Amino acid sequence: MDYKKLVAERIKEHVDLELENIEKLIEIPPKPEMGDFAFPCFQLAKVMRKAPNMIAAELAEKINKEGFERVECLGPYLNFFVDKVAFSKNIISKVLEEGDKYGSSKIGEGKNVVVEYSSPNIAKPFHVGHLFTTAIGHSLYRMLNFEGYNPIRINHLGDWGTQFGKLISAYKRWGNEEALEEAPINELLRIYVKFHDEAENNPELEDEGRMYFKKLEDGDQEAVALWERFKDLSLKEFNKIYDMLGVDFDSWAGESFYNDKMDKVVEELEKANILTESNGAKVVMLDEYNMPPCIVVKSDGASIYATRDLAAASYRHKTYNFDKCIYVVGKDQILHFNQVFKTLELAGNEWAKNCVHIPFGLVKFADRKLSTRKGNVVLLEDLLNEAIDKTRETIEEKNPQLENKEEVAKKIGIGAILFTYLKNSRERDIVFDWKEMLSFDGETGPYVQYSYARAKSILRKAEEQKITAEPDFTKLTSKEEFELAKTLEGLQKAVILGIDKLEPSVVTRYSIEVAKAFNKFYNNHTVLNVEDEGLKAARLELIKATAQVIKNALFLIGIDVVEKM
């Protein structure tokens, strides 16, 4: 039963407002003693020509109270107190019946949503900054899918640009074939950094890099073969990371994919009469929108990444007919996307308003800079492995007899990192703190995973007791039991709000709420040793439902649960 909808229906019987509008006005009171749902009567004052306080008092008298413990007025608010036993039984039954689908819906049915995320640069390391976009995008994909949308995952690889000319030059001068086969990204990074170091004293190297990129653009056999090799070796390394994270994509079409699609974009902009020549370059002037010009073709005739993004957006709309196209890219690109979207709009594309850039913050880690050019980079693979190693040490210390130690260490270690990325608003910067991140207390991934494992441990012990009594839900009368059941009800609301805000942290924080409510309940009430068998069975059903909800919430943010810890 959807209690919020029930509240709206009961109010609708007495007021002239649309059901949907009533539902939107319903609030959750800040304190339990003020009820479980509250309806502010201010909006009715004008229509009913009465003070909100009087309206609330009248409605409290008239309203059908079936399914509610009581309905009271408090000033201008109409407060609903649900029947706690009926509510808890209803939620527990719903969770256990729907299982892995609990919290899902079909609200997005028939809607295509493109999600572009991860998008690492070929021949460069997958560093800790790349995980931010990957974690957010993968979580949004799961959330959208869960609520019935058709999400399309795109990895817009950085596989084109003048840097590939520099890389070809560097490889031909200093490349080590053996090192390239053994550790491709490390070797490509080494020669890339060397190129920049040498170019500081020998500017002619930059010309050589441009020359090799021109060869690549012109389809020179050797240049294309080297570029393809660098790309294949890089993807092989990237896939190791994606496998660790459980991430996949529907399309790997990178920047190079749009090379033959950019002329058409330029033609369309010329046809729309918005392309202007400026210092030899072709640009779209955006002064009246308080933005610098969007450069589409450089003065030397070369394309720029804005050109490729314009081509990519057009291609995606034609291919996927999207209702929304989401770009999960750092906040340093806000201006770039504003220029691209405005250019698409000025070219007469109505769908441009459905293109959304969702920016995210920076990743800070022990004063180390994330600069690929200087080679000073915190590699993501190293970070993930370090998290697994540290978790393994904790397991060895706390539970050396645990089975599947390696699998558990991997799930907790990687889960801890993902949780850290997705715990707060995505635009906030992340500062890594191993001690806090891997702690089993506080608002962390291990704390939520431990809560799940604790619930499963209780259920395994209960199985050994061979309990045959039917659950007596009328005995679930304590404050902690009701608060836990109430928290379990909120999964779908959290997911839908997370989708509306394009903010996975809503679901992450919800998982913390469930874990806290569960631990508060368990710390205040005995379960396995309670004498009343009906109450024991009811509490076990509540625990079973809690484990299911934690599992579903963690799945949505890309984290696996562990059965034992």
Curated annotation (Swiss-Prot):
- Annotated PROSITE patterns: AA_TRNA_LIGASE_I
The superkingdom listed in its UniProt entry is Bacteria
The record's annotation in InterPro entries points to: aa-tRNA-synth_I_CS, Arg-tRNA-ligase, Arg-tRNA-synth_N, Arg-tRNA-synth_N_sf, ArgRS_core, DALR_anticod-bd, Rossmann-like_a/b/a_fold, tRNAsynth_Ia_anticodon-bd
Segments traversing the membrane: none
Q: Where is this motif: 'HIGH' region?
A: 120-130
Chemical reaction(s) catalysed? tRNA(Arg) + L-arginine + ATP = L-arginyl-tRNA(Arg) + AMP + diphosphate
Q: What is its main location?
A: cytoplasm
Cellular compartments annotated: Cytoplasm
A single Pfam family, by name? DALR_1
Q: Which UniProt keywords apply?
A: Aminoacyl-tRNA synthetase, ATP-binding, Cytoplasm, Ligase, Nucleotide-binding, Protein biosynthesis
Give the multimer and partner information.
Monomer.
NCBIfam families registered for this protein in UniProt: argS (TIGR00456)
Which family is annotated? Belongs to the class-I aminoacyl-tRNA synthetase family.
- Under which name does UniProt file this protein? Arginine--tRNA ligase
* Organism of provenance: Clostridium perfringens (strain 13 / Type A)
Source taxonomy lineage? Bacteria, Bacillati, Bacillota, Clostridia, Eubacteriales
